[in-house]
């Protein structure tokens, strides 16, 4: 588990260690590039964050147009101005979120109010004088002649801000300039203590009003330099010398006089419970003023996490893309409890986690159950176990499991009830230190009756689903995709029930998991939206979005990972299925493409479709397509083919590059396609290692020629995790041309469940 960075980060540097923190090596840490995914696609941010950290201090450089996709993460690489630094960010999501408690170093005259005005205090910057690494961010604000650098811990951060010019130096607090504005807040200046504290109430994910499903976040900021003056803004009105302000239109500033090259140090921490808890977080994690000590401590955390999954071979660009993808999967969910264990529950009451545990928040579950859950269970099993327990606590406090949550609020922006496959994948791949029996009982409770989570979402239309065996499209516009997601949910619940020894419930949910068959349309051989009277949606076309959430009938056709055999039979057999898949994968779409009947790499429902060839005896075609997928990623700001969605897209890259994909939710096992790298090593609990050797592996050698598992030849395209989890060695021989006999027999195919 992550350990808080205690007072020891302030000890004297070990003799012989170089003063320069950033050694020029090629370790996994050094190969992470946080700017990947900050361009036109990805929606990532480059700022400083510890693994799964509550606080993420990152620049914001987007402005007024909230409907503009560019504003979603708070940062876009192609912009050349910065308007502030926020203390919370949500990586890769498709709507505006967080960017809370913005502040901005300013030099000169404070002649404008920053309240609800992102243009008030802005500086140009250059990427040549901008640097980002895990836990660290720095930039030069050209217009203010300011050099700013920041390092983060789990709950806090330290900054060193050098004002090089001869103008008055200030730091402006502009909390209204977060993603969606604020509904309320307070700022307090304690001039004698050189401290600023406060809180804001905000929310409004996906362009909503900040008073819609709000949360509160508290902060404390300390400085090592006396204030020469200070004041607040209430709306447009500036009050010099005032130290308190409250409302939904607040701002504040502290000034340091003319510094002429002197650096001001700032320490800041947040809490979702109280200002007092923010103080405790700061004291526990950064009690000193030594910037480099904090850097080293957080770097050590990142190195420890990143070293659990390593690769050799490939190009440096490919290794950089790989380690950055792993990094993206260590950002969220976020630690939500304070250093004393306090957290704000889904019942809006303060709770305390059990000793040795942490509460987590920010679950983009519709996205992350497909890939991220498995990756986190493999490389961070302790943290992943706490995530599963956190979701159970959320359900106990909020009435039901959240489906898409931010902090202690359910936003429910996607269909399905993806908490179930997320938890089932965590369990299947080794994250098992949570209350399995209570989890099983909660899953059973919320899957037979519509119980909302904190007043929202829950298993929507579950009564219709149980009555009809599907969700009618004339009762819910996404009825078809809901049915497919619910079938996966049922299968996942079944696996948890099986693990908990509840055979009757296992059989019940396994039967329910075949609900996708109710959408079989003999006329089109597609999974077609259906009305409550049993009729199919008319008119209808394969690329029609009606009935489907972010996709269409052809893109969702493959969304039956637990029973591909039944889907194949319905399609007309393996030949017909292969022909359809050939057409579907003949075009690869990135970005936004829900209305085309082809493989859409840019969104999650299509992730697994390229692996279906393994069920058809055509493993070589999956191998070819996976390499095609990998080539759509790179190590530039535009290096992701779609929203990263809290790591889901990046995790797809990781598994594709490993040549192992967790295809069936809730089942511990991988579909095999062969590695991109000559060596992959996964460190397992107990000191064991899973090693993949890729002889001849490379970008031009996507095809498996042979595979040995612990020295034994196999042609199976499915590897059972139970046979790998205690350590194993996979020896692949890769080649430039396909071995069409490898993985071609019926016994070589992955399993189907019915």
Q: What are the residue ranges of the model-derived segments?
A:
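ATP-dependent phospho-/nucleotidyl transfer catalytic cores
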Residues: 489
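Bacterial Sec-dependent N-terminal signal peptides
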Residues: 1-25
């Amino acid at each position: 588990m992550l350990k808080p960075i205690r007072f020891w980060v302030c000890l004297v540097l070990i003799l012989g260690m170089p003063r320069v923190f950033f050694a020029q090596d090629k370790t996994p840490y050094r190969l992470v590039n946080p700017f990947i995914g900050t361009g036109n696609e990805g929606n990532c941010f480059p700022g400083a964050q510890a693994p799964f950290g509550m606080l993420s201090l990152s620049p914001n450089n987007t402005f007024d147009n909230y409907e503009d996709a560019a504003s979603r993460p708070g940062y876009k690489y192609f912009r050349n101005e910065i308007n502030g630094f926020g203390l919370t960010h949500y990586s890769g999501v498709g709507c505006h979120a967080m960017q809370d408690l913005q502040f901005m170093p300013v030099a000169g005259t404070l002649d404008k109010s920053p309240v609800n005005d992102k243009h008030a205090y802005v500086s140009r910057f250059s990427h040549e004088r901008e640097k980002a690494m895990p836990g660290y961010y720095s930039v030069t604000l050209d217009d203010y002649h300011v050099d700013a650098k920041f390092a983060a811990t789990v709950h806090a951060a330290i900054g060193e801000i050098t004002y090089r010019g001869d103008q008055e130096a200030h730091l402006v607090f502009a909390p209204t300039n977060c993603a969606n504005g604020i509904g309320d807040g307070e700022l307090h200046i304690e001039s004698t203590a050189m401290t600023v504290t406060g809180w804001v109430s905000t929310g409004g994910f996906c362009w909503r009003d900040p008073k819609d499903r709000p949360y509160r976040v508290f902060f404390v900021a300390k400085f090592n330099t006396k204030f020469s003056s200070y004041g607040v803004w209430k709306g447009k009105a500036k009050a010099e010398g005032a130290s308190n302000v409250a409302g939904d239109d607040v701002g504040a500033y502290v000034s340091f006089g003319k510094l002429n090259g002197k650096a001001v140090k700032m320490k800041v921490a947040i809490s979702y419970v109280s200002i007092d808890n923010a103080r405790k977080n700061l004291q526990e994690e950064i009690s000193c003023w030594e910037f480099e000590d904090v850097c080293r401590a957080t770097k050590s955390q990142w190195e420890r996490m990143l070293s659990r999954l390593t690769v050799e071979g490939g190009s440096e660009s490919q290794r950089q893309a790989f380690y950055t993808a792993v990094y993206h999967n260590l950002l969220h969910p976020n630690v939500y409890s304070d250093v004393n264990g306090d957290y704000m529950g889904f019942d809006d009451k303060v709770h305390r986690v059990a000793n040795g545990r942490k509460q987590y928040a920010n679950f983009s579950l519709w996205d992350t159950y497909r890939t991220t859950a498995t990756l986190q269970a493999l490389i961070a099993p302790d943290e992943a176990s706490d995530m599963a327990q956190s979701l159970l606590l959320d359900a106990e406090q909020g009435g039901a499991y959240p489906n898409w949550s931010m902090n202690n609020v359910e936003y429910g922006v996607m269909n399905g009830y993806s908490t179930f496959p997320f938890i089932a994948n965590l369990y299947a791949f080794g994250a098992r230190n949570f209350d399995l029996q209570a989890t099983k009982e909660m899953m059973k409770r919320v899957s037979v009756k519509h119980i909302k989570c904190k007043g929202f979402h829950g298993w929507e239309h579950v009564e219709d689903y149980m009555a009809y065996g599907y969700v009618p499209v004339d009762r819910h516009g996404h009825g078809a995709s809901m049915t497919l997601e619910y079938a996966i949910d049922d299968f996942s619940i079944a696996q948890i029930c099986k693990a908990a020894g509840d055979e009757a419930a296992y059989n019940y949910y396994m039967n329910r998991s075949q609900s996708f068959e109710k959408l079989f349309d003999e006329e089109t051989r597609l999974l077609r939206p259906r009305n409550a009277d049993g009729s199919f949606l008319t008119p209808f076309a394969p690329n029609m979005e009606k009935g489907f959430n972010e996709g269409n009938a052809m893109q969702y056709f493959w969304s039956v990972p637990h029973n591909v055999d039944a889907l194949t039979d319905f399609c007309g057999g393996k030949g017909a299925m292969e022909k359809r898949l050939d057409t579907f994968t003949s075009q690869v779409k990135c970005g936004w493409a829900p209305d085309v009947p082809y493989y859409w790499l840019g969104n999650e429902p299509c992730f697994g479709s390229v692996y279906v060839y393994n069920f058809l005896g055509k493993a070589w075609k999956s191998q070819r397509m996976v390499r095609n997928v990998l080539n759509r990623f790179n190590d530039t700001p535009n290096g992701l083919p779609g929203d990263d969605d809290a790591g889901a897209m990046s995790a797809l890259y990781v598994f594709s590059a490993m040549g192992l994909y967790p295809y069936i939710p809730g089942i511990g096992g991988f579909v095999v396609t062969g590695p991109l790298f000559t060596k992959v090593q996964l460190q397992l609990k107990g000191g064991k290692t899973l090693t993949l050797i890729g002889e001849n592996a490379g970008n031009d050698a996507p095809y498996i020629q042979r595979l040995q598992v612990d020295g034994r030849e196999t042609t199976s395209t499915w590897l059972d995790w139970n046979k790998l989890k205690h350590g194993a060695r996979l020896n692949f021989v890769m080649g430039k041309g396909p071995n069409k006999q490898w993985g071609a027999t019926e016994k070589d195919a992955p399993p189907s469940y019915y």
